[in-house]
Amino acid sequence: MDIKKRIDELRKIIEYHNDKYYNQDDPEITDYEYDKLYVELRNLENSHPEYKIQSSPTQKVGGTVKRELRKVKHDIPVVSLQDVFSKEEVYSFVEKITSEVTYPKFVVEKKIDGLTVVLRYYNGELKEAITRGDGSIGESVFENILQVKSIPKHIPSKLNYLEIRGEIYMTNENFIKVNEKQEEIGGKIFKNPRNLAAGTIRQLDTSIVKDRNLDIFIFNLEISEGKKFETHSETLEWLSNQGFDVSPNFKICETADEVWNAILDIEESRWDLGYSIDGAVVKVDNLNDRISLGMTSKVPKWTVAFKYPPEQKETVIEDIIVQVSRTGRLNPLALLRPVILANTTISKATLHNQDFIDSKDIRIGDTVIIQKAGDIIPEIIRSIPEKRPDWAKKYIIPDVCPVCNSKTIREPDGVDTRCSNPDCEAQSFRKIGYFVSKDAMNIVGFGQNTVEALMKDGYIKKISDIYILKNYKDALIEKGIIGKEKSVNNLLNAIELSKDNDIDRLITGLGIRNVGKQSAKILAGNFKSMDELAGAAYEQLIELEDFGPTTVPDILEFFNSNAYIELIKKLKEAGVNTISKTLQKKIDNRFLGKTFVITGTLPTMKRDEAAEIIQSFGGKVSGSVSKRTSFVLAGEEAGSKLTKAQQLGISIITEEDLKDMIK
């Protein structure tokens, strides 16, 4: 093997994956696979120091600072940990520490799979939050951190300065909910909770952060001016008493055997935690011992991270089927011979699209390796060609829809295949279900089972049929397909009530690709009616906050379709409101052309309430401060947005000022 060539190759591969992981939040390989590449490079460099260079990935932290967020210098560099993968390496670490420190104790904690943040408190008040970035300079995410409920904004202790580190993460339950909503709007499906948590905390729109319910575990106290501690475990107890969620169920150990057993205990429980971990961290407990042990050029000598390999199993693809989504996307699904993986029975896994199937050479009958992405979603890692039976069949996504037999089309600039028939029964079922859902028209009692029953008996085939169900009241009661008379009356009353919804709910319910609740509210606040919105030009839409070159063409295509023109005509005939109540409520347009940014905690109003008031007078509410911002409405704990507004000379107003402005 050409050592120099392999080292150069590994550096390029690792730099590529560093960028995908740290800066794009879209890793292509598992942490375990990455760690193996990294260890190979590190070992080669150690064996051949003549090839070691300062710019190597082994000599620096992987990320760079995202351009859109304010840069903040770290008081203490945020460095990586030394990874270990075997029992022998763990014992070697403990023995080395024992040879340098008298009677050391070790703390073993779960290694949460999330995004590290540094929190700064001044006199008990949270004032700053910073991501790791490149280890020396991070990015301020203070406004977003305020949306994380498990982070105290005030603590009992009034230390002059407190700096702590924690891991932002998303529970498995919330991750599934977010992906379900993304599926409903035809948006991006996230690979795992870590990617989603990392991408969310870097959002420029705080409302998105609030909706996604992030959490945090605090794992280290860095600076505590005015208070001294002897051990790490003591700091965790103190932080817990201050209201922080600290690394859960950590163990204090004295021997290598105890440390190893603690690591095994964590591994055994990892599938029942409700959130993702990718290892266990072993730390020297005594803080003075940590100082004496010091660090290498890159990692602390007093700690290591033991990385668990992802649990993988072999199984067989017994068949491949296609499901049709609400937006018409054909989703190939592998039906697997059932296998127990991470304490659950796995019998299917998504194959995403034709490119995915082809790149992995996946065939019906293949034996495949599967694991859970982020410990949640089953994914096929690779097929095993040497175990392929002679009869194994290549799979091609059909050129006709499996539900309605209409022609399918491959998106010219994408990887998805879609059904060309907007009236496809599979699409109609999901479209109707989404239209009546809580996030859209909120028709109480109109669940998926009701949709299925009414479609099966031919009472509804498309969205507009919902509003003529009252014509079949007697038949519905007689047949009892959705319950007795009271149930029928309740449903019909709920349908009538929905006619009076504001148009943001109607826009949401239409299921336009890449348009969810937040986008629908912006549209309803900028167009006085559905007709005006349908006639909007590209130039008008692209100027709206958070509407980009991906979303706007989808909106234009939808409103120019014959299907929409027919649907809106029938909805109007049924009496469904198509006028923006948000704009109707305007007393005047005194804020027309003005852009407001709301930051901090207001004395009596919620931010959403303040935003509605501003919008009702013609103003626009933005999630970020720029030269185009007219006013910043600031409450308590106003952070980086207030600072930027002051630097730009933008007018700062209070809640009282806003009230005076609308008198």
Swiss-Prot record:
UniProt source species: Clostridium kluyveri (strain ATCC 8527 / DSM 555 / NBRC 12016 / NCIMB 10680 / K1)
Name this polypeptide is given: DNA ligase
N-terminal signal peptide: none
An example molecular function term from Gene Ontology annotations: DNA ligase (NAD+) activity
Cofactor: Mg(2+); Mn(2+)
Any one annotated GO CC term: cytosol
Positions with a binding annotation for NAD(+): D31, Y32, E33, Y34, D35, S80, L81, E109, R132, E167, K283, K307
Record bears the keyword Ligase: yes
Entry similarity comment: Belongs to the NAD-dependent DNA ligase family. LigA subfamily.
PANTHER family (alphabetical): CHROMOSOME TRANSMISSION FIDELITY FACTOR 18 (PTHR23389), DNA LIGASE (PTHR23389:SF9)
UniProt-annotated binding residues for Zn(2+): C401, C404, C419, C424
Stored Pfam families: BRCT, DNA_ligase_aden, DNA_ligase_OB, DNA_ligase_ZBD, HHH_2
Origin superkingdom: Bacteria
Keyword line: DNA damage, DNA repair, DNA replication, Ligase, Magnesium, Manganese, Metal-binding, NAD, Zinc
